[in-house]
């Protein structure tokens, strides 16, 4: 500071305003961390020091989280206590002082430049901190210390003042126009005359220029200013003083209390300073505490004369011509001070504001919304949603039929049942539409998924597309740091679907709320946290708030937030209706006076969030910015569901504080606005209070979207719909109109015009304020009392992008299905036509770097948008699913170079340029001549270039191109180089470093220049095969020429002298060309350099290839060290280039690779094409002379992309990202299918009848089809009916029809169920009324009988009706038997609605002849020729087959032909039993037809009486008249077909002479009674929901062994069998996944159908069972697409070799044929007890118990891989603790083809039966018995992982006890058996496993798996077997250990770690811990293993010596992808060990 200039720091008094100052501080604090910390610390100090104060003081402050909240309380009101005023003005001054100290540290100077300090009244307190502020840190500390002092001072003055007068009012007045002494005298006289006690008298406290301040009690001051003669007429002002000051009598004790006892107070004061404002400014103080006492005394007790202070100051500074006054905070005395100082002729500068600071680019704490998507009523996307808003549409409608039957629940008034008085809602058009294949979800699982979850998946993907999210190799966001927040609060879909679909393996994840968010993370492979939130109507706002919090806390880097609501459960309507919140008249009437509740609605929405700074850095489109968000609760509301306006206002203010904005900055408010009578006024009241003091004339516009689309209360219209609307307002720059307006407003609203709030009825421009963003306040509150709020800002980014230097660009699109493929292209094309001005570079950038890529791909390179449009229009073909091919880098040799060959890339590609420059630098350092111009300059003179320059330039170019390819993710699988190109190949493979390869090429070229004469030799290219070329050369008189290159099968190069080559060319007949090279490379001309070159090459390092090299010298692949060395390089220089041999070596090792040439132009590509003939699209050239480099590169990238290459698009575009913009291109074209279930109420749930009897539930539709349980409306119509077998009428039908003494449902019941169901459907969906006679049954087929044994007496018959074809009058009907979760397919038929008159007319033409035949049979019987039977005899004979109750016995007399081929009868139908209801009575149907059954089964000529003919269907049943009971009818039966095991009959029914019914093709098949008994009495214990197949009657034949040594050429005769196999595979996949066979295209990925590893095992087992062919569960890996299955399993009629047959023969040599050809054998129902040998040798019976709730234990052996019957002993691998062999599905194939069978746990499906009484011994008994049955002879090879290893050992023991030998045993990571039971530790073992497994989705278990794991843990803990005797031990045992323990997985679980420590369970290894019996079945696996822990670890006591292997993984990682290949290696070594001789 200049010596003639002085700084003055001015601190004003306590009455100054703090309003602007406090806002400015907090605004600056947003970008100044230390300032934010100070304000937080200051707040804490104030709050701490006021905790114990009295209620008056505490209440004056209230609750505040920060000082800005405190400021809000008094921004527009007066602080009658004064403490808040004191705190806030102090905070302003302290903050500004600290800022100045930071900005200008010299202000704390202690030398002659020390500023002067001036404090006016209470300003002295703020000033005092400077006395101890040698540094900024000390100043900071002192400010906090004085804050505590200020709090105590306020308390002292308040208490003192209130002791005089406890009332509100001003304690200070300013009086003008009277001197101080005159005023004192006047006050004394008047107060004395009024008798005012001295202690209460007002006094002069402060004197200024022509004014004085008097201080005293408010009542005294009021009296004085109004009545005192000397004052009452003078000008005067009331001051913001609310306690005594300058007039208080204080004692030393008072001052000590105020100053406090901090250690800082004792700090000595060494500074010399003047305290202007004190009576004695120059007084000296020993300590800071002394000074503070003096200051407090001055401010409290001593009057102040400001004029005197200023005069003294001016006098002292008279020698300083320049003064700099800095006002620390506001000061009302500043102008007086400066005027006095200026009056002496000095220059005075004034700084009355904060110190200068650099404003932040963005305010911190901002969150960018970078992507959004949504769908709801009337809209499938946000654009359509915006159109709904702009059109003011009200989308309320009556509840549609596809949700539920409204008539069942709607009542005009509520009654006691489940009723609703509203009919309305707002609904999505197609809530069930879902692209399941895109998300790899089977139709079966998709239907079980909550539609909200499905829709959320799709909107999330759409939002991610808008956000430009890409999952490529280079990612802007780490997937481990992406979080998902999903709002949901109901489980409607579970209630809708459960009683229709029952329970399934996918039910839990389908409807459980946590899966809404979890499935998002799973689908996109994210590892960040997932949250499923329920905060009722504010769930979305809450999810966004939590997402923002997580992002700001840096816990995550990207968040997906949103919610979904799809309403369809009627009881939600009924409960809400009864609670009175729903409108009975329609939609939400937001703001209106007729508001009467809200309207329920669908909506789904998603937003993608990032921190603003990250979004800018990632080049994202920022749709809007979340400036702040918040949530609180209406804790003081009148009820939990009532909103509290005060709580809402508090939240608004808090959020604005956090955002550093004020109510003046808000442009629009999107209100919750549900239209309820209480909620709307409360919300508007909160806004009115918030905006009551706005300073801007512009109105606040408010609106609410619920008036358009209703209120999806549980999840989103309360949040995400409003949010999407707000974002669109920013995007469109429009304030939209409010639906339902204009209209009279809610009368409970405050007067909106007075508070400047406006509700628009027409759209208007959304204008931007000057120099600040537009801001929207979005408000939500929920039904549970919560409030949520979001403050949005728009983001102005008007940066103009420069042009991309690249002139050609690659544009792509991709999909998962062909339909989506064409849809994506069409949508892109449409968008381009609508946006022709879009830049091609932005389209390319968006479609490549900012998209996720899928298998079916399109790519094209274009230079303009118009060119792109043309190419899109021209391409209409399908695209196959891409499969990634290996890439071969093919490096060009010399001879193709040209000037400027890399000039375009050098200018535009940083990677290429940097690599080329590096090569040039290295070459310069090695003293090689410059060559860069050859690459970079098109006008470079080529004729002047030497071989040295050319070869270095070509090599550098190729290395640069390779670097460019590798930088964008294209890595070669193998490299090959032609001649010089091999050097580039060796560098790229890692053999030669960059310096070495340049050195070798440069030195070799120098040697050539030195030793070889230029232009004396030549090279001739000839179009001849190498053999012909060689023969031609041999025939020459002078064979000096030689072959230099074998380029292709028909192209060679000859080298020799120019003379010889010229002569040779003249004699050639083949086409030839002289090459433009100066030397004869690869010829004898190179001989002079070889020795020296080899010596030079000996000095470089040759490393092992990291990438295989196809050597053109050796014609083989090289991937190991030792091949490349100096000698090789010399030979490579001299010997021919065998390019063909190298190509063939690649072809033999790599399947269908992509050939990518890297060089100056296309040269080697033609050689590849001529030699190998690959597809043209797989031969690529990086550069093409004469073509722009980016065009040729683009073509290469397009082809690579279409062939499945993973290109790092983000890396490609990164250098140019500042020139690129992310476009909002069309979203993915979904391939949608319908997954929807209509809710149908069961009978006992329907509303009961009302008292007036007008509203009752409907009776049963039919006894056989009682109620509708599902109704899906057209076009995908499906109606499902149920009928309970326990219904008395139904039960009588079954009980009255007995086969072999078992009740069996009559076949006529199925006809009745079908006819009744179709009749119902027709009446429901057709305008015409169709009667029964018009319905015809066709092709009825029954698969199995319906019995009580099948489903129990409480089972159900399910009838399903669906469209049967293109005709609307044809239906397919299917029947199932159901019990709980189990269902069985019973049969199906077609039902057609026909014209009965046409049928009758057709019959009338022939009925006479049939009726005549009836008469003939009757006459013949009466004459004794045929048989005449009375009913007693007929039904008595028939009882041998079937016994009927009386209701069925309607035959009055029967007439049977003598050959039993015809029969007739007279029938009189009985009335149906009371209580039944039929459309076509089964009693009548059975009675009219069962004569046919009698004829077939009672025929005396039948050869066997041990069989029964069962009716299993008919061709058709037609009827034109409804029969009547009591009326006689004639029936006629004729046998029309009779084969060995089947009989076909026709049945005709006559009413007199009129034919009224005809059953054609009634089919009976013969069944052995033994089989029939089993069929009728069998029980199926499966707990799955899928239909079980009918029993297979015939046995499989065991194929004979095949002599695999014999080669047979024959035409396959198995095409029909193969077709059956393929058909079975596809049908079973279809059934298991729920997919439609029609959707199975060749490119359909099986994983896309939802087939996971567990389902794969089920499918493989069923295929094996059905076809006899062993399909391995790994088929989903081996054959990933449907086309792969078709190629492998399709019928073949080609020559085949038996040893290569793809079918898998059975075990036929050393394995029992009991396994036959089945890869999956089940062994059911073992004995109910198993025998176990205990330690003592006694026999113990272990009772499994009845446990009727779970199936019996069952062993399943499944072929996992290998070839049965190949002479190898099978390896049996027992399932681990999960119980399922799915654990092993990731094991790669073993080259040995050893057959590996997996053995599931017998308790997999019944883990509750796996008790400790059963234990390891009991479980192993099941396995042992199954193995002995499967393999009666030979030795065994066993193994198991984890708990499976323990079972394997016990099976080994039991086999030994049965005298069966185990040859080899493989134990994978399992401790040896413990010598004792670990007490009370099993629970900790399970806790350990739960903690470690939940971190890995691959090990997340189902409930059943979890139960099995717990059971195996308990079993292992209690298993203490005897060691095997030496004679019983396996010959060889191998043990494989996991080297890593699982403790790292536990480290993040603090609770578990504490529990481990408490239990004393070790987490570190110690000697022999693996054998410690104190460690339970899991705890042993916690510590990491040392080398000493990788031995047998106790197993040697049980099995003897063992080979011990280990792998670097932990226990759970071993069988999982990423580590399973290591396990495969160790198992391979174990198998080799097993097979070793000896």
UniProtKB/Swiss-Prot annotation:
Location of O-(pantetheine 4'-phosphoryl)serine modifications: 1653
Region (Disordered): 1700-1738
Induction of the gene: Expression is positively regulated by the zearalenone biosynthesis specific transcription factor ZEB2. Conditions for carbon-, nitrogen-, or phosphorus-starvations lead to very low expression. Increase in pH results in gradual reduction of the gene expression.
EC number: 2.3.1.-
Region of interest: Malonyl-CoA:ACP transacylase (MAT) domain: 888-1172
Enzyme's top EC category: transferase
Domain (Carrier): residue spans on this chain: 1616-1693
Polar residues biased stretches: 1709-1737
Its job: Non-reducing polyketide synthase; part of the gene cluster that mediates the biosynthesis of zearalenone (ZEA), a nonsteroid estrogen that is a contaminant of cereal grains and causes estrogenic disorders in humans and animals. The ZEA backbone is synthesized from a single acetyl-CoA molecule and eight malonyl-CoA molecules. The reducing polyketide synthase ZEA2 is proposed to synthesize a reduced hexaketide intermediate by using different combinations of its reductive domains during each round of condensation.
Protein name (Swiss-Prot/TrEMBL): Non-reducing polyketide synthase ZEA1
Gene giving rise to this polypeptide: ZEA1
């Amino acid at each position: 500071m200049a010596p003639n200039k002085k700084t003055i720091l001015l601190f004003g008094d306590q009455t100054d305003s703090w309003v602007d100052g406090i806002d400015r501080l907090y605004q600056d604090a947003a970008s100044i961390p230390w300032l934010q910390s100070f304000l937080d610390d200051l707040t804490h100090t104030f709050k701490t020091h006021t905790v114990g104060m009295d209620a008056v003081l505490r209440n004056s402050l209230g609750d505040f989280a920060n000082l800005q909240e405190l400021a809000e309380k008094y921004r527009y009101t007066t602080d009658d206590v004064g403490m808040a005023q004191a705190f806030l003005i102090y905070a302003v001054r302290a903050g500004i002082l600290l800022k100045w100290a930071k900005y200008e540290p010299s202000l704390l100077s202690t030398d002659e430049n020390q500023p002067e300090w001036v404090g006016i009244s209470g300003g002295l307190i703020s000033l005092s901190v400077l006395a101890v502020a040698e540094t900024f840190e000390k100043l900071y500390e002192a400010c906090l210390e004085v804050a505590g002092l200020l709090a105590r001072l306020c308390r002292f003055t308040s208490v003192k003042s209130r002791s005089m007068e406890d009332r509100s009012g001003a304690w200070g007045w300013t009086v003008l126009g009277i001197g101080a002494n005159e005023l004192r005298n006047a006050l004394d006289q008047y107060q004395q005359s009024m008798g005012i006690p001295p202690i209460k008298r007002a006094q002069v406290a402060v004197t200024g220029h022509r004014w004085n301040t008097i201080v005293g009690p408010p009542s005294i001051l009021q009296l004085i200013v109004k009545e005192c003669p000397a004052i009452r007429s003078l000008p005067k002002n009331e001051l913001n003083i609310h306690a005594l000051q300058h007039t208080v009598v204080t004692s030393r004790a008072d001052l000590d209390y105020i100053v406090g006892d901090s250690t800082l107070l004792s700090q000595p004061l060494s500074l010399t300073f003047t305290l202007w404002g004190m009576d004695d400014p120059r007084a000296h103080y020993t300590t800071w505490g002394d000074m503070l006492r003096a200051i407090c005394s001055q401010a409290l007790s001593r009057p102040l004369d400001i004029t005197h202070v200023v005069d003294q100051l001016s006098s002292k500074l008279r020698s300083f011509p320049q003064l700099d006054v800095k006002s620390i905070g506001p000061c009302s005395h500043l102008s007086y001070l400066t005027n006095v100082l200026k009056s002496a002729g000095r220059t005075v500068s004034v700084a009355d504001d904060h110190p200068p600071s650099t404003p932040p680019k963005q305010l911190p704490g901002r969150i960018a919304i970078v992507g959004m998507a949504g769908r709801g009523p009337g809209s499938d996307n946000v654009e359509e949603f915006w159109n709904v808003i702009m059109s003011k549409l009200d989308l309320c409608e009556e509840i549609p039929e596809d949700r539920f039957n409204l008539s069942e629940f709607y009542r005009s008034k509520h009654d006691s049942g489940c009723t609703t008085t509203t009919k309305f809602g707002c609904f999505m058009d197609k809530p069930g539409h879902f692209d399941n294949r895109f998300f790899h979800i089977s139709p079966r699982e998709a239907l079980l998924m909550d539609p909200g979850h499905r829709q959320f998946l799709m909107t999330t993907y759409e939002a991610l597309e808008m956000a430009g999210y890409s999952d490529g190799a280079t990612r802007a966001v780490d997937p481990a740091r992406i979080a998902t927040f999903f709002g949901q609060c109901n489980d409607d879909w579970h209630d809708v679907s459960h009683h229709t679909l029952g329970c399934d393996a996918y039910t839990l994840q389908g409807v459980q709320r946590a899966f809404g968010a979890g499935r998002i993370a799973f689908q996109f492979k994210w590892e960040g946290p997932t949250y499923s939130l329920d905060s009722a109507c504010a769930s979305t706002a809450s999810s966004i708030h939590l997402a923002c919090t997580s992002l700001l806390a840096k816990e995550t880097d990207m968040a997906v937030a949103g919610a979904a609501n799809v309403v369809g459960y009627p009881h939600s309507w009924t409960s809400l209706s009864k609670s009175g919140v729903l409108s009975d008249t329609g939609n939400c009437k937001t703001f209106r006076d007729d508001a009467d509740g809200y309207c329920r609605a669908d909506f789904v929405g998603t937003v993608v969030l990032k921190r603003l700074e990250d979004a800018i850095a990632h080049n994202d489109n920022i749709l809007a910015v979340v400036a702040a968000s918040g949530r609180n609760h209406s804790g003081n509301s009148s009820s939990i569901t009532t909103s509290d306006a005060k709580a809402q206002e508090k939240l608004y203010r808090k959020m604005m504080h956090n955002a550093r904005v004020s109510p003046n900055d808000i442009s629009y408010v999107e209100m919750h606005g549900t239209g309820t009578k209480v909620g709307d006024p409360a919300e508007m009241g909160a806004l009115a209070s918030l905006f009551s003091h706005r300073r801007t004339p512009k109105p606040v516009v408010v609106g609410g979207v619920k008036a358009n689309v209703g209120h999806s209360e549980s999840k989103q219209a309360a949040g995400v719909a409003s949010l999407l609307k707000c974002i669109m307002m920013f995007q469109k720059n429009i304030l939209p109109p409010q639906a339902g307006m204009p209209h009279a407003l809610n009368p409970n609203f405050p007067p909106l015009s007075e508070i400047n709030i406006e509700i628009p009825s027409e759209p208007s421009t959304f204008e931007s304020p000057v120099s600040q963003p537009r801001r929207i306040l979005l408000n939500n509150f929920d039904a549970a009392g919560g409030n949520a709020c979001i403050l949005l800002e728009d983001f102005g980014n008007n940066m103009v992008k420069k042009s991309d230097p690249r002139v050609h660009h690659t544009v792509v699109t991709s999909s998962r299905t062909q339909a989506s493929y064409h849809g994506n292209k069409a949508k892109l094309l449409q968008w381009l036509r609508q946006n022709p001005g879009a830049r091609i570079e932005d389209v390319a950038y968006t479609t490549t770097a900012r998209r996720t890529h899928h298998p079916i791909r399109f790519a094209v390179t274009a230079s303009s948008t118009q060119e792109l449009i043309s190419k899109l229009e021209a391409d209409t073909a399908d695209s196959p699913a891409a499969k990634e091919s290996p890439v071969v880098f093919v490096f060009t040799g010399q001879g193709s170079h040209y000037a400027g060959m890399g000039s375009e890339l050098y200018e535009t590609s940083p990677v290429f340029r940097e690599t080329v420059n590096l090569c040039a630098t290295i070459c310069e350092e090695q003293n090689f001549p410059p060559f860069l111009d050859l690459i970079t300059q098109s006008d470079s003179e080529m004729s002047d270039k030497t071989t040295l320059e050319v070869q270095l330039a070509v090599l550098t170019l190729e290395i640069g191109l390779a670097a460019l390819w590798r930088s964008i993710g294209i890595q070669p699988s193998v490299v090959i180089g032609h001649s010089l190109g091999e050097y580039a190949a060796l560098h790229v493979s890692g053999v030669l470093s960059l310096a070495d390869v340049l050195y070798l090429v440069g030195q070799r070229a120098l040697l050539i220049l030195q030793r070889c004469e230029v232009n004396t030799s030549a090279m001739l290219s000839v179009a001849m095969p190498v053999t012909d070329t060689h023969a031609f050369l041999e025939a020459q008189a002078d064979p000096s020429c030689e072959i230099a290159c074998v380029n292709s099968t028909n192209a060679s190069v000859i080298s020799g002298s120019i003379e010889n080559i010229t002569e040779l060319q003249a004699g050639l007949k083949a086409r030839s060309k002289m090459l433009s090279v100066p030397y004869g490379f690869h010829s004898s001309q190179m001989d002079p350099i070889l020795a020296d070159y080899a010596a030079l090459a000996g000095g470089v390092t040759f490393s092992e290839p990291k990438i295989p090299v196809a050597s053109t010298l050796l014609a083989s692949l090289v991937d190991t060290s030792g091949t490349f060395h100096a000698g090789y390089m010399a030979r490579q220089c001299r010997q021919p280039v065998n390019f063909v041999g190298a190509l063939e070596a690649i072809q033999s090792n790599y399947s269908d690779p992509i050939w990518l040439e890297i060089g100056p132009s296309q040269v080697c590509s033609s050689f590849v094409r001529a030699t190998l003939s690959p597809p043209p699209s797989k031969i690529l050239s990086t550069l093409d002379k004469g073509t722009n480099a980016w065009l040729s590169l683009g073509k290469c990238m397009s082809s690579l992309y279409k062939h499945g290459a993973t290109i790092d698009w983000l890396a490609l575009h990164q250098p140019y990202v500042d020139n690129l913009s992310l476009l909002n291109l069309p979203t993915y074209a979904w391939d949608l299918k319908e997954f929807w279930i209509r809710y149908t109420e069961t009978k006992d749930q329907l509303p009961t009848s009302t008292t007036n009897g007008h509203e009752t539930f409907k009776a049963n539709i039919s006894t056989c089809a009682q109620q509708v349980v599902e109704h899906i409306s057209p076009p995908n119509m499906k109606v499902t009916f149920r009928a309970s077998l326990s219904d008395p009428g139904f039960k009588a039908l079954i009980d009255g029809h007995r086969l072999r003494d078992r009740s069996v449902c009559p076949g006529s019941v199925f006809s009745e169920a079908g006819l009744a169901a179709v009749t119902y459907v027709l009446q429901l969906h057709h305008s015409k009324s169709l009667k029964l006679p018009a319905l015809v049954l066709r092709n009825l087929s029954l698969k199995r009988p319906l019995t009580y044994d099948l489903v129990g007496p409480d089972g159900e018959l399910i009838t399903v009706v669906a469209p049967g074809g293109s005709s609307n009058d044809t239906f397919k009907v299917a029947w199932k038997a159901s019990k709980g979760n189990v269902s069985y397919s019973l049969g199906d038929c077609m039902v057609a609605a026909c014209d009965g008159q046409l049928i009758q007319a057709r019959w009338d033409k022939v009925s006479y002849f049939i009726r005549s035949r009836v008469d003939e049979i009757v006459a013949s019987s009466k004459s004794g020729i045929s048989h005449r039977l009375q009913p007693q005899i007929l039904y008595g004979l028939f009882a041998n087959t079937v016994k009927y109750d009386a209701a069925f016995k309607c035959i009055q007399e029967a007439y049977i032909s003598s050959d039993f081929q015809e029969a007739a009868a007279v029938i009189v139908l009985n009335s149906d039993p009371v209580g039944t209801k039929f459309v076509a009575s089964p009693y009548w149907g059975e009675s009219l037809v069962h004569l046919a059954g009698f004829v077939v089964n009672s025929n005396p000529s039948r050869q066997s009486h041990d069989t029964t003919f069962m009716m299993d269907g008919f061709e058709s049943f037609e009827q034109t008249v409804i029969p009547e009971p009591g009326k006689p009818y004639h029936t006629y039966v004729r046998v029309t077909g009779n084969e060995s095991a089947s009989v076909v009959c026709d049945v005709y029914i006559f009413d007199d002479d009129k034919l009224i019914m005809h059953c054609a093709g009634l089919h009976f098949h013969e069944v052995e009674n033994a089989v029939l008994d089993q069929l009728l009495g069998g029980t199926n214990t499966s707990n799955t929901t899928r239909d079980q197949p009918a029993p297979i009657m015939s046995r499989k034949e065991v194929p004979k062994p095949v002599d695999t040594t014999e080669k047979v050429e024959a035409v396959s005769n198995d095409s029909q069998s193969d077709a059956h196999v393929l058909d079975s595979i596809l049908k079973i996949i279809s059934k298991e996944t729920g997919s439609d066979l029609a959707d199975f295209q060749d490119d359909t990925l099986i994983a896309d159908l939802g087939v996971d590893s567990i389902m794969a095992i089920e499918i493989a087992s069923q295929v094996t069972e059905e076809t006899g062919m062993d399909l391995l569960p790994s088929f989903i890996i081996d054959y990933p697409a449907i086309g792969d299955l078709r190629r492998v399993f399709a019928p073949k009629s080609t020559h085949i070799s038996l040893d290569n047959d793809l079918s898998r023969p059975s075990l036929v040599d050393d394995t029992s044929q009991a396994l036959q050809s089945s890869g999956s054998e089940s062994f059911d129902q073992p004995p109910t007890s198993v025998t176990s040998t205990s330690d003592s040798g006694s026999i113990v019976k272990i009772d499994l118990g009845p446990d009727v709730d779970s199936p019996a234990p069952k062993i399943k052996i499944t072929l996992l891989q290998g070839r049965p019957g190949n002479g190898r002993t099978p390896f049996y691998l027992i399932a681990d603790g999960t119980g399922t062999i799915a654990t092993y599905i990731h094991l790669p194939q073993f080259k040995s083809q050893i057959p590996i069978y997996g053995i599931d746990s017998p308790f997999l499906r019944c883990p509750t039966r796996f008790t400790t009484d059963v234990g390891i011994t009991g479980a192993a008994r099941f396995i042992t018995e199954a193995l002995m049955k499967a393999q009666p002879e030979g030795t065994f090879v066993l193994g198991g992982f984890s708990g499976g290893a323990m079972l394997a050992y016990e099976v080994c023991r039991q086999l030994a006890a049965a005298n069966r030998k185990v040859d080899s045993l493989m134990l994978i990571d399992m401790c040896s058996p413990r010598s004792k039971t670990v007490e009370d530790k099993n629970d900790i073992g399970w806790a350990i496993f739960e903690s470690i497994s939940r971190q890995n989705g691959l090990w997340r278990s189902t409930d059943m798996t979890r139960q099995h794991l717990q059971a195996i843990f308990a079993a292992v803990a209690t298993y203490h077997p005897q060691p095997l005797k030496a004679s019983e031990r396996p010959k060889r045992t191998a043990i494989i250990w996991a080297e890593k323990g699982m403790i790292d997985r536990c480290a993040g679980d603090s609770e578990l770690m504490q529990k481990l420590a408490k239990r004393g369970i070790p987490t570190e290894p110690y000697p022999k811990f693996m054998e410690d019996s104190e460690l339970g079945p899991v705890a042993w696996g916690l510590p990491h293993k040392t080398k000493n822990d990788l031995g047998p670890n106790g197993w040697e006591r049980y099995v003897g010596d063992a080979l011990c292997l280990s792998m670097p993984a932990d226990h759970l990682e071993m069988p999982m992808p990423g580590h399973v290949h290591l396990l495969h290696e160790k198992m391979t070594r174990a198998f080799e060990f097993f097979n070793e001789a000896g």
